[in-house]
Regions:
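Peripheral membrane interaction modules
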Residues: 1-118, 122-239, 243-252, 256-291
Length: 291
């Protein structure tokens, strides 16, 4: 069994990192990818910032800053800007949704013509490109925060989307991470068998405010399971984790356990061979992990 504390990190590669945090990107960012920063704001925080730069990780007289995000507790604002050849552009401001002493989740998604910025899974701003994103070389976080994890990944997905698990199956102890934003009345995440059976059907339904769990084996649906919370909200992003344990699949939403589904297959360490995602969902990331 894996404890809830072991699940709370929402990404398989998350580790605590020092601040300031400086990363030189080894690959160019691509549209559809998301930069994720999460941690805890210091109790006495005044400001922290995130910068996407080229040429140097430091802001100087000749800097190129494609995106500057300044979270200001002393002003109650989040300020967005860019810098070209050492000169700041025009600021764009929104209210600051973060609080001193609390956990935060800040995400920057790259699109063809803009950055989409979300705070605690809710979009707060779109920043149109002023400089080409393709020249971004550095990703820097500074200021009054403690970082629990920094990573980037994802892509654009067309639904329905289907993929096989690495090594051909989902072994006991492995996890599936699904990142997305609900956009309509329902979506589903299905764990598939080799013969096409749906061994686990995960189906949030907004009109009913229920998460329906079931299995379709031999073209026959079994008994629905509907108990438990409904934590989803339209247009609010989520991180889901599905943990394959010997007797059940444990389900976590944004780090909190939301339910379990007892296996309806004889060999759960071998029988889940793939995943299918469909419905009214903007899928932003999908990952598999041993731990």
């Amino acid at each position: 069994m894996v404890s809830l504390l072991a699940i709370r990190r929402e990404h398989p590669g998350d580790v605590a990192v020092p601040v300031p945090y400086v990363s030189r990107l080894t690959q160019k960012l691509q549209p559809g990818q998301t930069l994720v920063i999460h941690g805890t704001v210091n109790n006495d925080a005044k400001r922290f910032e995130v910068n996407l730069l080229s040429g140097s990780s430091e802001i100087g007289s000749n800097s190129q800053v494609m995106l500057h995000v300044s979270v200001r507790f002393d002003e109650g604002k989040v300020v967005f800007n860019s810098m070209e050849n050492g000169t700041w552009g025009k600021e764009e401001r929104v209210s600051n949704p973060f609080k001193p002493g609390q956990e935060f989740d800040l995400r920057i998604r790259i699109h063809e013509d803009k950055f989409e910025i979300s705070a605690n899974h809710k979009e707060i701003h779109e920043f149109k490109f002023r400089l080409p994103y393709s020249s971004i070389e550095y990703f820097v976080v500074r200021g009054d925060v403690k970082l629990k994890g920094v990573h980037w990944g994802g892509r654009y997905y067309t639904l329905p989307f289907e993929t096989q698990f690495e090594d051909g199956h989902l072994a006991s102890g492995q996890r599936v991470y699904v990142y997305g934003t609900p956009k309509g009345e329902r979506f589903n995440i299905d764990f598939i068998a080799r013969n096409g059976d749906i061994l686990f059907h995960f189906n949030p339904r907004f009109k009913e405010k229920k998460v329906v769990r079931n299995a379709e084996i031999g073209k026959a649906w079994g008994a629905e399971e509907r108990e438990g919370p409904f934590p989803f909200k339209k247009d609010i992003g989520f991180d889901l984790v599905f943990l394959n344990e010997p007797y059940s699949i444990q389900i976590f939403h944004d780090g909190e356990r939301m339910g379990t589904f007892a296996h309806r297959t004889k060999n759960p360490g071998e029988d889940y061979i793939g995943l299918r995602v469909a419905g009214d969902l903007e899928l932003t990331g999908l990952e598999f992990s041993q731990h």
